[in-house]
Amino acid sequence: VTRAWRAPAPADAQELDPGAVFEAGLRNHHVSNTAYPIAHGRTWAPYRVAAEDAAAVAVDAWAGIDDLCLYVHIPFCETRCSFCEYTVVKREEAPGVGEYMDDLRRELALYRAALGTESRRLHGFDIGGGTPSFVPAEQIASVVEQARSAFLFAPGADISIETTPRIAAAEPAKLEAYRRAGIERISMGVQVVQPDLLRLLNREANGIACHRQAVENIRAAGFARFNVDLMYGFAGQGLESWRATLQHAIDLGPEYVTLYRMRYKLTRISHQAAEVTLEQVRPLAALAKHMLADAGYTANPGKTTFSRLAGDVGTSSYLARRVQDGMPYLGLGLGAQSFTHTTISYNDGAVGKNLFPYHRSLERGRLPLQDLYDLPLAQMAGKMCAVSFYFGEIRTGPFRAKFGRELEEVYPAAVDLVLRQGLMRRTAGALSLTPAGAEQVNGVIALFFAPSVQRYLVERDPDGAEDLHRNRAASLRVAGEAALA
């Protein structure tokens, strides 16, 4: 497919020394990860589309895209966990659940009318948050039904949803309703099991007391694809406490276990990042890989989801198609991100994290776009490569199909370095991390970022940088302006 990307800004036309970039990624390991881009207010500023043009550019960007995935964001939670970096609204806004779900349906209807979605094939559908299971089950079922009528579901496409242990244990009827609606995969956030750490993270209500009942209810509802999320890399998290968390998760018997390293950026505990070094994190990751392997869970080096089912990658089809194929995805809901071949956009609420601007846009019958970026190949390829590291490899066929160029042609110096230093190797249809590369993934991943992002990393001082911390003043200003508009 021939595509036209906009010309890069001067900052994305430069070439940096790959060795310096690799070292900068390791040095800035808390931000050099799959959460691409970094400092987008600076690195993506040249590509921001004027607000009055955003809707037209968004619709044009979807032209010719027949295969995509869908993500629906539910921003409500019982409590906000201290480690959360996502778009979650305050508990005081919970009474607005009904109105918000109406807005979601309005947004999907707008895209259906603008894009003619009925002829487009959906390859995966994730319902995330927040805590999707916080809202009434009939609201979830209604959104699923609307999505089924708006798109063609491709063979193999599944629907996945997230829950907390407490809700899964206390509200089994919700789980049964999800299965009736056709949701096949469920993910439960265990994260950690130590009481002191749960208290620190504001997750005491989701302690181990409710886990067994939660799993019983999940199985009784008919879920045969069950994932448990765990987190590591917290300040003060020792090897033995992590071992206990891993063993507990294994004993719950899920089909999949997904490991998330704590990223700190924009969280309530971002100030603790300085206490966590790579030397502390690596033994935790190694222990997890060994314990999960001994229990029958496998993953190639660097992959974050471990599966005990042969031939099953373990993730939802939404994430698999995003990561492995760079497939476009449409994001609905507060602050949701959408990705085409040439653009990335963020919905209203991505900054202020309040419902009003999102609701106002939909009430006025317009797409709720806060920011839309028309990006050059260097940035779109950087995004695709960055998320590929969820699976520990970059698939060369999908890269070629998307960009019309070989991976080695776009990244000659990066590919040379990772092969020469044994950080990645050529496998069937992919450039894959080696065990050594997985240990140094923060450096490896930076080699595939766009030059402006690499420059930012090279110049960034991890001890003095403020980008880990949410600019609260800016967030409040955006929220205030939205309320007055």
Each model region followed by its residue ranges:
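Short beta-strand motif preference
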Residues: L70-V72, M188, L433
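C-terminal scaffold of the Radical SAM
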Residues: D60, R91-A113, R121-R405, R460-R470, ...
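Canonical Radical SAM [4Fe-4S] cluster-binding loop centered on the CxxxCxxC motif
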Residues: G64-D102, R199
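Short amphipathic alpha-helical interaction segments
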Residues: R405-L417
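Flexible, acidic/Gly-rich N-terminal and inter-domain linker regions that tether
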Residues: V1-C69, E118, E459, D467-A485
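Beta-strand-connecting loop/turn residues
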Residues: C77, E255, G429-A430
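A short, conserved structural fragment
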Residues: L419-G429
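Accessory beta->alpha helical hairpin/"wing" motif in late/C-terminal subdomains of nucleic-acid enzymes
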Residues: A428-I445
